[in-house]
């Protein structure tokens, strides 16, 4: 059995190498070779999405592969350039750099450093719970919005036209006005690459489709001299490895990048943890969210110091490694070795990659992000879930990638507050043949105890729902068909309380007392009891009206 890695200090990845089993080697080697073949063209493509030279994608890949293998808690996750962070990088930096390519590169590296520092500090502060900030509907809608923005950003690349604008609607409008100037050789090449990628995915899912498609396009361009006919190629790529260094940036630029870096950090971390948990669950492993924060932080710092840009997890590369048999992060180290070999000895081949082929690769990746089956699933489950997903997509398209991320987080929080502010509640009764007390709405045959209302409010009590709780509890009393003598609050769901909620509880007790109704509480856990004591409510309610179980509360009512 593979041991879980829930806690291994700052380097949980070391455990997998310390306990490495020889039978895993074949799968890890195959996964490393496959992921490297996938990563090289993908990293170059995402660098262009970020607004940087293709080589920057390779630079941003090297150090994170090694660092995550040691510091990450997932044995499957692949770290490197990815679509969402690349798009956000472009959205943040394009207005700041104003066409200055050198300044753009410096800002990109600085952004990576800031994202890394924020994640590292958050991990040290044990803020791993932030991984739950995005609900499923918001995540589905957000990824669909990101996909559409990715496609719009590549319209010029795959058609050979000049597309202006930095946002979805401006790019689509610009493309629509220049569609008659499509460079057909470029467009045909891009569509051919896209078709080949689609066929490989369907008929040979384990094959490294991106490198096969891009190499095929490169051979076609070289054999037919298509670059002389207007098909753009990557051009010269510096051979060798990047020299680490701190980007020379001003204090003003640092201030301007802090908030965008926080947004990218949230996306990077939440995407990584969600992906890592999904794949870890398949093998009965655990993922330490705080370790993931620290690992992703260190990876981004390293990417910034090696002239890269913010990096994140890749679900596609992770899935590929898992499918071909990768069992540990040794596959990432093997992929790293191949990337280094290519950069040192085969930069001339990379220079011949057609830009249109890289653009087609981005479009292909974007199309895979749009999960129509999930939209249908949301629609079947609850209409409000579907509307939340569509609203998130609209926010990304209308507000841009960065503010769309903030809107996505805000929508998740608002959805959470909506549920907390107006949760399910119930009046409990006895059901013949079933032990305990149950919701009378679920069991029409349930029998209530005359004169007794047993009420349950299914959420922690806090400022967001304090007034809702008080109002609905009184409504239950008002709607009772008989003369209410006792009101018992079943507090099993109300362990967490704040002072606002306890004030509302006291107001409810006071109003019931004014009506001649006894207020009591059942299933009161020790934490709640201590909170009641701290708020001076325990004495007001009375120890004789605080019960450990519902049966003892009902028995006390009957003995009154």
Curated annotation (Swiss-Prot):
Annotated localization: Cell membrane
InterPro entries noted in UniProt: SLC26A/SulP_dom, SLC26A/SulP_fam, STAS_dom, STAS_dom_sf
Keyword terms: Cell membrane, Membrane, Sulfate transport, Transmembrane, Transmembrane helix, Transport
Domain of life the protein comes from: Bacteria
Domain STAS stretches: 442-557
Annotated GO MF terms: guanyl nucleotide binding
Gene Ontology biological process terms, A to Z: sulfate assimilation; transmembrane transport
Record membrane topology: Multi-pass membrane protein
Membrane-spanning intervals of the chain: 29-49, 51-71, 79-99, 105-125, 138-158, 184-204, 207-227, 256-276, 333-353, 355-375, 394-414
NCBIfam families: sulP
Name the record gives this protein: Probable sulfate transporter Rv1739c
């Amino acid at each position: 059995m593979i041991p879980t890695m829930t806690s291994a200090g700052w380097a949980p990845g070391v455990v997998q190498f310390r306990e490495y089993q020889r039978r895993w080697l074949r799968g890890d080697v195959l996964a490393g070779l496959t992921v490297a073949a996938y990563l090289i063209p993908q990293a170059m493509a995402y660098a262009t999405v970020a607004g940087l030279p293709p080589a920057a994608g390779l630079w941003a890949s090297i150090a994170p592969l090694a660092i995550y293998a040691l510091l990450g808690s997932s044995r499957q996750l692949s770290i490197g350039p990815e679509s969402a962070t690349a798009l956000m990088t472009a959205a943040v930096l394009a207005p700041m750099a104003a066409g200055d390519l050198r300044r753009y590169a410096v800002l990109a590296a600085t952004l990576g450093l800031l994202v890394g520092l924020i994640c590292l500090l958050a991990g040290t502060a044990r803020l791993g719970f932030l991984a739950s900030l995005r609900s499923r509907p918001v995540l589905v809608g957000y990824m669909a919005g990101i996909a559409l923005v990715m496609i719009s950003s590549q319209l010029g690349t795959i058609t050979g036209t000049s597309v202006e604008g930095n946002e979805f609607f401006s790019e689509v409008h610009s493309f629509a006005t220049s569609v008659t100037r499509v460079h057909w050789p470029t467009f045909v090449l891009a569509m051919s690459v896209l078709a080949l990628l689609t066929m490989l995915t369907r008929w040979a899912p384990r094959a490294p489709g991106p490198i096969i498609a891009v190499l095929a396009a490169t051979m076609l361009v070289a054999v037919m001299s298509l670059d002389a006919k207007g098909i753009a190629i990557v051009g010269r790529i510096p051979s060798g490895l990047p020299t680490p260094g701190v980007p020379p940036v001003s204090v003003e630029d640092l201030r301007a990048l802090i908030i965008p870096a926080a947004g990218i950090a949230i996306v990077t971390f939440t995407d990584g943890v969600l992906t890592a948990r999904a794949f870890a669950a398949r093998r009965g492993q655990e993922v330490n969210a705080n370790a993931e924060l620290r690992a992703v932080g260190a990876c981004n710092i390293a990417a910034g110091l090696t002239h890269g840009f913010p990096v994140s997890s890749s679900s596609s590369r992770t899935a590929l490694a898992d499918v071909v048999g990768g069992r540990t992060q040794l596959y990432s180290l093997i992929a790293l070795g191949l990337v280094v070999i290519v950069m040192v000895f085969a930069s001339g081949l990379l220079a011949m990659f057609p830009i249109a082929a890289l653009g087609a690769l981005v479009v292909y990746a974007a199309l895979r992000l749009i999960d129509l089956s999930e939209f249908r699933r949301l629609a079947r489950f609850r209409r409000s879930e579907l509307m939340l997903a569509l609203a998130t997509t609209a926010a990304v398209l209308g507000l841009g990638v960065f503010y769309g991320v903030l809107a996505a987080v805000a929508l998740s929080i608002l959805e959470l507050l909506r549920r907390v502010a107006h949760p399910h509640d119930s009046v409990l009764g006895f059901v013949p043949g079933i032990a305990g007390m149950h919701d009378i709405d679920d069991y029409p045959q349930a029998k209530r105890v005359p004169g007794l209302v047993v009420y349950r409010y299914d959420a922690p009590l806090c400022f967001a729902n304090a007034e809702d709780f008080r109002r609905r509890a009184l409504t239950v009393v008002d709607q009772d068909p008989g003369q209410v003598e006792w009101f018992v609050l079943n507090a099993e769901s109300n362990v967490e309380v704040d002072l606002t909620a306890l004030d509302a509880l006291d107001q409810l007790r006071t109003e019931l007392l004014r009506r001649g109704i006894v207020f009591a509480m059942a299933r009161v856990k020790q934490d709640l009891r201590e909170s009641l004591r701290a708020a001076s409510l325990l004495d007001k309610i009375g120890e004789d009206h605080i019960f450990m179980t519902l049966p003892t509360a009902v028995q006390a009512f009957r003995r009154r």
